Amino acid sequence: MGSIIDAAAAADPVVLMETAFRKAVKSRQIPGAVIMARDCSGNLNYTRCFGARTVRRDECNQLPPLQVDTPCRLASATKLLTTIMALQCMERGLVDLDETVDRLLPDLSAMPVLEGFDDAGNARLRERRGKITLRHLLTHTSGLSYVFLHPLLREYMAQGHLQSAEKFGIQSRLAPPAVNDPGAEWIYGANLDWAGKLVERATGLDLEQYLQENICAPLGITDMTFKLQQRPDMLARRADQTHRNSADGRLRYDDSVYFRADGEECFGGQGVFSGPGSYMKVLHSLLKRDGLLLQPQTVDMMFQPALEPRLEEQMNQHMDASPHINYGGPMPMVLRRSFGLGGIIALEDLDGEDWRRKGSLTFGGGPNIVWQIDPKAGLCTLAFFQLEPWNDPVCRDLTRTFEHAIYAQYQQG
């Protein structure tokens, strides 16, 4: 009888998946991970924690465990939260998705477009053609880019026009000029940082207060904040950031500025710290369309492709040509995608009924955090690492293994 049970366990995809995570921890391929899955009905409530929250041993020579309530840096997984906050402002009539941002973000409206450099090396700046809307910001079609992703902005910074991100002031993040006009192309950039400023100006609240009152309070969340340094209860048990050395693959502690000081203001595109369990509450609320954060019709809008065909084609070409960035994390690179209000939308099933379905919404964060909400399958999943850089092959493969196992288990009932 024992051998029959052992054989059944060995064939169970969830057992095999969990074994893969434990082996990755034991072989020091990852410090730790938290993986979670929920369904609409409440029948699936899956959480597993593996390994440690740091590679640094404590005073007892132990590695403290990574747990479901360990405060972690969300990085760009913050963008979903800021999208929700902006859509709440829309629901309350404080801003319209297609209204120009001139009224609330005149500083953004006045920003020029960097076209290039003349023969003498001087920047060529021009006025923007067209008006930026909130929809442009939420879909990364405003013409803004991150400095590290765009050669024109890297050159602009090299000439001394921009401060280093080490200053950790939001103005340095918001200062770079645009690189194209609104609606001209899909470019990943500081759009959600600007959307966060829009929420602040529309409501008269800073983004931390707004987050606490409008996301944390409705969901009973107590460990989510932009202001980690002001939360000694979270600081004492937070995860460290770990970095994988590209030369030999070894892990090392990363003394990141994000953990040493709060930003001068709230970064709507990257600034939140949260326990994995609390972030899952947000995902599950959206999956259930329970009205605690957004009206059901607004949630439905998030899952509608928001790009016109030309922009959708350009975004797919850009993503296909950028495997080193791999915005979709574990998604197949050949998949047809669009962008919704909050993340990447799959325009086809990833693997029939055995993985994410057409219409699923996903994004992530730099420490290899990947979230996805799949309305058709009735599932949401979350893979939480605190290991950089993004698109780490070990984390990516483990995330795929996790999601496949959950879908297989769920299909079996």
Curated annotation (Swiss-Prot):
Pathway involvement of the protein, from the record: Polyketide biosynthesis; lovastatin biosynthesis
Protein name (record): Monacolin J acid methylbutanoyltransferase
Residues that bind monacolin J: R73, R173, Y188, Y258, E388, W390
Additional record remark: Directed evolution toward higher catalytic activity with free diketides led to an enzyme with 1000-fold higher activity in simvastatin synthesis, due to numerous mutations that affect protein folding and promote optimal alignment of the residues that are important for substrate binding and catalysis.
Pfam families linked to this entry: Beta-lactamase
Single Gene Ontology MF annotation: acyltransferase activity
InterPro entries: Beta-lactam-related, Beta-lactam/transpept-like, Diverse_Enzym_Activities
Residue stretches in coiled coil: none
GO biological process: lovastatin biosynthetic process
Superkingdom: Eukaryota
Binding site for 2-methylbutanoate: G366
Gene3D superfamilies according to UniProt: DD-peptidase/beta-lactamase superfamily
Active site: S76 (acyl-ester intermediate)
Known function: Monacolin J acid methylbutanoyltransferase; part of the gene cluster that mediates the biosynthesis of lovastatin (also known as mevinolin, mevacor or monacolin K), a hypolipidemic inhibitor of (3S)-hydroxymethylglutaryl-coenzyme A (HMG-CoA) reductase (HMGR). The first step in the biosynthesis of lovastatin is the production of dihydromonacolin L acid by the lovastatin nonaketide synthase lovB and the trans-acting enoyl reductase lovC via condensation of one acetyl-CoA unit and 8 malonyl-CoA units. Dihydromonacolin L acid is released from lovB by the thioesterase lovG.
Entry keyword set: Acyltransferase, Hydrolase, Transferase
Nucleotidyltransferase recorded as keyword: no
Complex formation: Interacts with LovF.
Reaction(s) this enzyme catalyzes, per UniProt: monacolin J carboxylate + (S)-2-methylbutanoyl-[2-methylbutanoate polyketide synthase] = lovastatin carboxylate + holo-[2-methylbutanoate polyketide synthase]
E.C. designation(s): 2.3.1.238
Use in biotechnology or industry: Lovastatin acts as a hypolipidemic agent that works as inhibitor of (3S)-hydroxymethylglutaryl-coenzyme A (HMG-CoA) reductase (HMGR) which reduces HMG-CoA to mevalonate and is the key step in cholesterol biosynthesis. Lovastatin, simvastatin and related compounds are widely used to treat hypercholesteremia and reduce the risk of cardiovascular disease. Furthermore, statins such as lovastatin were found to be anticancer agents.
UniProt similarity note: Belongs to the class-A beta-lactamase family.
Catalytic class of the enzyme: transferase
Gene disruption: observed consequences: Loss of lovastatin biosynthesis.
